[in-house]
C-alpha cells in the first residue's frame, strides 16, 4: 500500500505557511547564518586557487549551516532566516560592504537550467564518481595542473552536497520524520529510485543553489512531468505511491519554492530600495521556472498523468515555481482546460507554443532533437535544457533608432526625397551596423574561451554536463550551444511610430517629416493637433492590415539582419536567436526616451515585450491576439505577451468554455506566448488605498509574478497604465 505517512499527511499547513511567509515575512529578514558562514569560508580559503576556494568554501558552509525541519515537511530542506539584532545588522552591513552578497570566488549568477535528467539518472554519487574518474585519469597522465585543480574543486562540490543530504537526514530523524530521513540517506549514496527520492534530490540541489551559491538564481527546474513519470509509474505499480500522495509531495515542493523567497519586486520596486534585496536573501525575488507538457524529440506530446497532477496542485496565490506549459496541437484536452483554468485564476503560469518555439530554435541553428528539449528561464529567455550558455543578450531598440534617423534626416536635408520604403532601408542599415558591431564584440570574447580554460568553477558547471563530463566551465564551452540573443524591445512603440510615418507623413501628407521632428523635439508643446493625429493613427493590436503589415516588415528586417550573422568557428555550436522581451525597461527606458511619433510624450512608458501599446486595444482581446499571432516568428524563440483581463469576463468565459477555445485559437493562428493578470482597474486602485486587504493580489510583470501591494507606487502606477483587454 502507499506510504502511510504520506497518506495521512495533511498539506494545508504547508500552504498556509508558504502564503503567510510570502505576505508577511519581514522585508529585512536575512539569511544571516549563511552570511556568517560564507564570511568564515572566505577567510579559510583565502590562499587557495579559485576552484578549491569554491569546493572547500561550499563544504564549510554546507557542513555547518543549520537545517530547519518542521513537523509538516514532506520534503526536507530549508534555510534559516532572522531579522537581525542591532549587532547582527551591523555585522551584515559591514560584511556586505567588504565582500558583497558573496565573495568573488562564488560566481554563480543563475539564469540557466541544469541537466536534471543526468542528476536523476546518476545521482550525486554517480556525478562525483564521474568527476573523480576524470581527475584520476588526468593525474595519471600528468595533465594540466589547472584542470586537475578544477576537477578537485568539482569533486568537493559533489561531496559537499552529499554530506549536506546526510545532515538533512539526521535533522529529519531528530524531528521524527523517519520516512523523509530514509529518503535522504538513499539519495546521499545512490541515484534516486522512487518518485519521492527524485523530487527530494531536485529540491536539495535547488535549495543549495538558490539560497547559498547563486545570486539571483533564476533557475529552470526542467520538464519534471517527463523526467519523473517513470519514477511515478513504477511507484504506483509497486504500491508505494498513489496519486493523492504524489500530489502532496508536489504541493510541498511548490511550498518550499515560496518559503525561501524574500519580499518585494526586483525590477522597479528594488530601485526604490524598500524590500529585501539580493544581499539579504540570494533568492529574494527570483522566478524559478518549471516546464510541463510539450513535444518530445519524436514529435509526440508528453502530457501524462503526472502533468495533470502538477497542474492540478498549482496554488494560485504562489509566486514560484513559475509554470511554463508548452502547448502543442496534441495537448491533452482535459489538461489544456486545467491549464487555462489556472491561467484564468491568476496563477503563476505562462504558455508557449511548441510549434513556434521549436521551429525558431531550429532556424537559429539548434538540432531538431535538442530544440524539442527547450526550456525557458526567467524572464522568458530560451535555452536548450541545461545544454546552452547565453553570453549575449542585446536589446535592439528600433523605436530609438527611428528617433535617431529622424534627427539625421532633418540635418542632412533628405526628408523631401524620402518615402516609407527608403526610410525602412535606412532603418535596416542603421540597425545592421549596430547589431554587427555588438555581435562581433561578443563573438570575439567567445572565441577566446578555449585559450582560457578551465575557467571559473561554479556549481552550475557541475550540473550542466551531459553524459561526457568536460573539465572546464560552462562559460568556456563545456555545453553544446552558445546562444546569441538579439531582442526587439518595445515592438509596438516602433510599429506604431512607423505607421505614423507611412500613413500621416508619406501617404496622406498630413504633416512633413520636418514638422514631426520639430514636434518631437518640443515634446509636442505647441503641436497638440499634430500629436492627436499621431495618437489616433491605427495602432498595433487592432488587427488591421496596415499595422499588421508594419509588424511583419519590422520583424522581417530584424530577421534579415541577424540571419547574416556568422556564429560558426566557435568551440561549440553557435546559435543566433531573436526575442520579444523587455523586462521592465519599458518604464525605465521610457523615462529616458524623448517623445515618439506614435504620440507618446517624453518620459511616458514605452510598449512592453510583445504587447500592444497601452490604450491601443480598442478592438478588443480577439483583435489583439490575432495581431500578435500574425507577426512573423521565424527565429523569434521567446517573448512575453502580457494580457490583463477582467475577472468577471474570465469567470464567465470559463463557464461557457470560451477561454480555453480562445487561447487555443490564438496559438493555432501562430501565437507564441501568453501570460495573464486577472484583475480589474477598480481592484488595483483599491489595493493602492488599502494594501492589507489585497495581499493575495498577484500580477504578471514580464516573466514572473509580483504581489501588487509590495510594488512601489511608481511600479503600481505603471502597471495600472495597462488597459483591460476584453472581448
Where in this protein do the model-derived segments appear?
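Conserved catalytic cores of very large enzyme subunits
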Residues: 1-154, 176-727
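Extended non-globular scaffold/tether segments
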Residues: 152-163
Amino acid at each position: 500500500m502507499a506510504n502511510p505517512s504520506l497518506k495521512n499527511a495533511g498539506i494545508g499547513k504547508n500552504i498556509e505557511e508558504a502564503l503567510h511567509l510570502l505576505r508577511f515575512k519581514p522585508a529585512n529578514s536575512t539569511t544571516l547564518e549563511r552570511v556568517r558562514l560564507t564570511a568564515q569560508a572566505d577567510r579559510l580559503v583565502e590562499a587557495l586557487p579559485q576552484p578549491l576556494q569554491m569546493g572547500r568554501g561550499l563544504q564549510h558552509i554546507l557542513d555547518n549551516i543549520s537545517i530547519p525541519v518542521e513537523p509538516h515537511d514532506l520534503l526536507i530542506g530549508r534555510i534559516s532566516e532572522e531579522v537581525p539584532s542591532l549587532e547582527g545588522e551591523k555585522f551584515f552591513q559591514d560584511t556586505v560592504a567588504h565582500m558583497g552578497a558573496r565573495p568573488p570566488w562564488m560566481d554563480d549568477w543563475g539564469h540557466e537550467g541544469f541537466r536534471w535528467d543526468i542528476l536523476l539518472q546518476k545521482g550525486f554519487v554517480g556525478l562525483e564518481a564521474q568527476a573523480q574518474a576524470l581527475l584520476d585519469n588526468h593525474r595519471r597522465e600528468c595533465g594540466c595542473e589547472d584542470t586537475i585543480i578544477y576537477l578537485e574543486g568539482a569533486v568537493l562540490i559533489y561531496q559537499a552536497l552529499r554530506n549536506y543530504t546526510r545532515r538533512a537526514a539526521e535533522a529529519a530523524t531528530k524531528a521524527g520524520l523517519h520516512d523523509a530521513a530514509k529518503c535522504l540517506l538513499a539519495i546521499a549514496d545512490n541515484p534516486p529510485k522512487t518518485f519521492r527520492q527524485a523530487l527530494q534530490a531536485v529540491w536539495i540541489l535547488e535549495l543549495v543553489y538558490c539560497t547559498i551559491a547563486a545570486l539571483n538564481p533564476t533557475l529552470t527546474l526542467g520538464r519534471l512531468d517527463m523526467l519523473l513519470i517513470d519514477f511515478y509509474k513504477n511507484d504506483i505499480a509497486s504500491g508505494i505511491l498513489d496519486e493523492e500522495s504524489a500530489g502532496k509531495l508536489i504541493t510541498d515542493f511548490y511550498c518550499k519554492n515560496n518559503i525561501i523567497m524574500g519580499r518585494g519586486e526586483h525590477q522597479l520596486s528594488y530601485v526604490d530600495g524598500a524590500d529585501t534585496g539580493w544581499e539579504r536573501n540570494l533568492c529574494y525575488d527570483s522566478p524559478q521556472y518549471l516546464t510541463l507538457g510539450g513535444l518530445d524529440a519524436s514529435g509526440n506530446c508528453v502530457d501524462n498523468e503526472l502533468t495533470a497532477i502538477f497542474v492540478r496542485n498549482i496554488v494560485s496565490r504562489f509566486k514560484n515555481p513559475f509554470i511554463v506549459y508548452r502547448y502543442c496541437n496534441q495537448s491533452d484536452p482535459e489538461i489544456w482546460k486545467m491549464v487555462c483554468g489556472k491561467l484564468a485564476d491568476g496563477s503563476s503560469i505562462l504558455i508557449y507554443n511548441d510549434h513556434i518555439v521549436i521551429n525558431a530554435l531550429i532556424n537559429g541553428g539548434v538540432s531538431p532533437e535538442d530544440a524539442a528539449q527547450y526550456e525557458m528561464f526567467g524572464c522568458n529567455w530560451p535555452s536548450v535544457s541545461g545544454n546552452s550558455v547565453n553570453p549575449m543578450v542585446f536589446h535592439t531598440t528600433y523605436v530609438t533608432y527611428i528617433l535617431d534617423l529622424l534627427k539625421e534626416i532633418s540635418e542632412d536635408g533628405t526628408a523631401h526625397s524620402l518615402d516609407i520604403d527608403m526610410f525602412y532601408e535606412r532603418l535596416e542599415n542603421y540597425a545592421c551596423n549596430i547589431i554587427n558591431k555588438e555581435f562581433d564584440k561578443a563573438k570575439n570574447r567567445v572565441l577566446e574561451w578555449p585559450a582560457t580554460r578551465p575557467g571559473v568553477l561554479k556549481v552550475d558547471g557541475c550540473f550542466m554536463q551531459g553524459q561526457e563530463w568536460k573539465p572546464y566551465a560552462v562559460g568556456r564551452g563545456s555545453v553544446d550551444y552558445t546562444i546569441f540573443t538579439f531582442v526587439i524591445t518595445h515592438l509596438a512603440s516602433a510599429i506604431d511610430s512607423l505607421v505614423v510615418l507611412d500613413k500621416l507623413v508619406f501617404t496622406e501628407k498630413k504633416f512633413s517629416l520636418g514638422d514631426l521632428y520639430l514636434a518631437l523635439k518640443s515634446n509636442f508643446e505647441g503641436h497638440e493637433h499634430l500629436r492627436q493625429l499621431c495618437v489616433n493613427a491605427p495602432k498595433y493590436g487592432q488587427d488591421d492590415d496596415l499595422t499588421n503589415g508594419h509588424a511583419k516588415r519590422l520583424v522581417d528586417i530584424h530577421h534579415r539582419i541577424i540571419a547574416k550573422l556568422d556564429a560558426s568557428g566557435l568551440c561549440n555550436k553557435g546559435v543566433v536567436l531573436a526575442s520579444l522581451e523587455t523586462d521592465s525597461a519599458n518604464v525605465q527606458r521610457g523615462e529616458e526616451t524623448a517623445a515618439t511619433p506614435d504620440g507618446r510624450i517624453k518620459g511616458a512608458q514605452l510598449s512592453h515585450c510583445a504587447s500592444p501599446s497601452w490604450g491601443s486595444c480598442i478592438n478588443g482581446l480577439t483583435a489583439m491576439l490575432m495581431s500578435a499571432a500574425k507577426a512573423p516568428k521565424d527565429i523569434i524563440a521567446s517573448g512575453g505577451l502580457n494580457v490583463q483581463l477582467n475577472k468577471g469576463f474570465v469567470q464567465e468565459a470559463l463557464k461557457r468554455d470560451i477561454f480555453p477555445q480562445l487561447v487555443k485559437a490564438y496559438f493555432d493562428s501562430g501565437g507564441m506566448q501568453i501570460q495573464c493578470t486577472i484583475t480589474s482597474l477598480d481592484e488595483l486602485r483599491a489595493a493602492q488605498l488599502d494594501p492589507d486587504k489585497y495581499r493575495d493580489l498577484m500580477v504578471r510583470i514580464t516573466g514572473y509574478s509580483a504581489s501588487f501591494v509590495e510594488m512601489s507606487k511608481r511600479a503600481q502606477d505603471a502597471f495600472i497604465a495597462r488597459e483591460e483587454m476584453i472581448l
